[in-house]
């Protein structure tokens, strides 16, 4: 990787587009002065924004295209209309051509995953992409995947997710051997689905040097911080993330209306507002923006479509770190080197009788 | 149903047993003076508790047994050791024999579901039991099922869950035609699993008089109150519930430690503590205790194993209401009467050309 981190941005992605992406990039640049940007999209919209951020302008190149994938496009429509021409595709292609180290888009998730898969192709041994997000816990943070890039999957898929999530966590949290748990339920006698039990057995017998498999984790174990990486197929991962987000939002609403209902509570709130700010800071989805699309020959980060400039900057931060600390190499090592996750299981030595 | 509501209690169930169950029953009796109780378990433990609650004692009968299912017993162990003899089994059997209108147990979930299935048998047309819980939402409350009585399931299973959940919601919320949504994710082009889409089509074409099918609901739609009933198979239902519970607990922890860190915030908290009490009241799991085991020839309510007397009383309240308002008849109507959920789909009339 060259000295600079070269970041390709889909400047048209998200609910707002350039008016969020460009100021967001400017914020990220202030935190990472060694970043450079390729900005793909409608130059008539990008350039006026860029003119307001001269430092960003100095390290950016604008590549014009009229075509943008809309937030409503289905993946197949996006591919049909936007392949080779859209700002989303061109940002991904820059990574493919080696002109950028990472692509960041706030465009629609389904389209981005489909295009990334089509443009960058899957890593050797990986069948399907996955979306990984950073989740706040009581103890610190954890990585949860897959959040819905695809749904379902056998034990090998779960093991691949564990390996990729482990590599991501080792980069993000600077842990050489992050703990990994499989999301499961504790009610049934024989716990959970067959494929989860199988994946657990595989991970245990592999005993990978790059990750520490700790067993099953239930839904409430995510927030408790029971593991650095929580692995599950995309359906339940998506449900878990959204149910938790919904519960938090609902609680904030309830608290707000309870406080509004009493003037004493309002005074109390004013006095305690420092504490509330700490809380909001810790749980604000904006601070956890930036899901990583894993499993590809290239690094792609998905920003929330509705995020503001500060939120988008966080997604750029994630992309920067993934590129700077060479996520792809780490993933490949975990998957393939020294009896990695995709190597055949070691044969037990026969005991001498 | 006779004038009185007769409630069979597994007095040994839960982490504590009689010392929670008996005071809990006393609290529930104060709210429902027309209840009567059958108390199954070790009379040496039950009677001393009962002596402290003379009003409860006056409407209770103690049926002694030495055998209790432990919280650690696997379902198969519980059945082997506790069938026909344990306090859990005897409470269920009282319902089967028509001596009680409902059974309530805080015993272990897997054992209770297995025993209930074995003792009471499934309703006609229902293959598997389901666990339904009441969930607080921004707007009011909703019913979520299945929370893990079994995992997986085809479209017919989901339709049966919708019908049973609808009947439960109509009793709980006094709505003649509660809204029902299928839990799903919104990322993939063709949303979610095949069986969910199929179930959606079936529910739409059935257009049942007892429930209003509104389509798919995402994970964050549960807390928003998008439907009175949220239907999903047991794995994702369990994950959703626990992830949301975990997020709420985590948030309360964060808030608590943020407030503790500043004396100004502590004063603010004192002033606002009425508002916090309102919040706690609204989200306290204790106030939502009591999951209903659905699909059986009889009403069974599961209390959380770790709940206190007030929590257990809530579970008894749920059981009381289910019996008083004749949940079973409502379920059977929704399932079978007038082209109910289990009737064959109506054949479209041919248009006269």
UniProtKB/Swiss-Prot annotation, chains A, B:
Catalyzes the reversible formation of acyl-phosphate (acyl-PO(4)) from acyl-[acyl-carrier-protein] (acyl-ACP). This enzyme utilizes acyl-ACP as fatty acyl donor, but not acyl-CoA. The keyword Cytoplasm applies. It catalyses: a fatty acyl-[ACP] + phosphate = an acyl phosphate + holo-[ACP]. This is Phosphate acyltransferase. The keyword Thylakoid does not apply. The lineage of its organism: Bacteria, Pseudomonadati, Pseudomonadota, Alphaproteobacteria, Hyphomicrobiales. It comes from the Bacteria. Pathway: Lipid metabolism; phospholipid metabolism. It comes from Bradyrhizobium sp. (strain BTAi1 / ATCC BAA-1182). Its main location: cytoplasm. Its EC number is 2.3.1.274. GO terms for biological process: fatty acid biosynthetic process; phospholipid biosynthetic process. InterPro entries: FA_synthesis, Phospholipid_synth_PlsX-like. Homodimer. Probably interacts with PlsY.
């Amino acid at each position: 990787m060259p000295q600079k981190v070269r970041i390709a941005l889909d400047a048209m992605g998200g609910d707002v587009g350039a008016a969020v992406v460009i100021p967001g990039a400017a914020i990220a640049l202030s935190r990472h002065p060694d970043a450079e940007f390729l900005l793909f999209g409608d130059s008539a919209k990008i350039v006026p924004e860029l003119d307001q951020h001269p430092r960003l302008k100095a390290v950016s190149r604008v590549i014009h295209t009229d075509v943008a994938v809309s937030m409503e496009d289905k993946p197949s429509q996006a591919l049909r209309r936007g392949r080779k021409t859209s700002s989303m595709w061109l940002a991904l292609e820059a990574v493919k051509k080696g002109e950028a180290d990472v692509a960041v888009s706030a465009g629609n998730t389904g389209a981005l995953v489909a295009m990334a898969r089509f443009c960058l192709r899957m890593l050797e041994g990986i069948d399907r992409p996955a979306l990984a997000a950073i989740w706040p816990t009581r103890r610190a943070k954890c990585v949860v995947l897959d959040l819905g890039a695809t749904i379902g999957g056998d034990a090998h898929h779960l093991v691949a997710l564990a390996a990729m999530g482990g590599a991501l966590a080792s980069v993000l949290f600077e842990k050489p051997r992050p703990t990994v748990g499989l999301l499961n339920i504790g009610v049934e006698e024989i716990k959970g689905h067959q494929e989860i039990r199988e994946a657990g057995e595989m991970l245990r017998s592999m005993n990978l040097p790059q990750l520490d498999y700790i067993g099953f984790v239930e839904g409430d174990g995510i927030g408790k911080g029971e593991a650095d990486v929580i692995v599950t197929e995309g359906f339940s991962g998506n449900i878990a993330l959204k149910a938790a987000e919904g519960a938090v939002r609902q609680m904030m609403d309830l608290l707000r209306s309870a406080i509004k209902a009493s003037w004493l509570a309002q005074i109390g709130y004013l006095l305690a507002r420092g504490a509330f700010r700490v809380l909001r800071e810790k749980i604000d989805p904006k601070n956890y923006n930036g899901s990583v699309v894993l499993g590809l020959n290239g690094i792609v980060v998905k920003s929330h479509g509705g995020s503001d400039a500060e939120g988008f900057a966080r997604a750029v931060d994630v992309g920067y770190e993934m590129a700077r600390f060479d996520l792809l190499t780490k993933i490949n090592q975990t998957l393939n080197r020294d009896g990695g996750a995709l190597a055949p299981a070691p044969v037990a030595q026969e005991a001498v009788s």
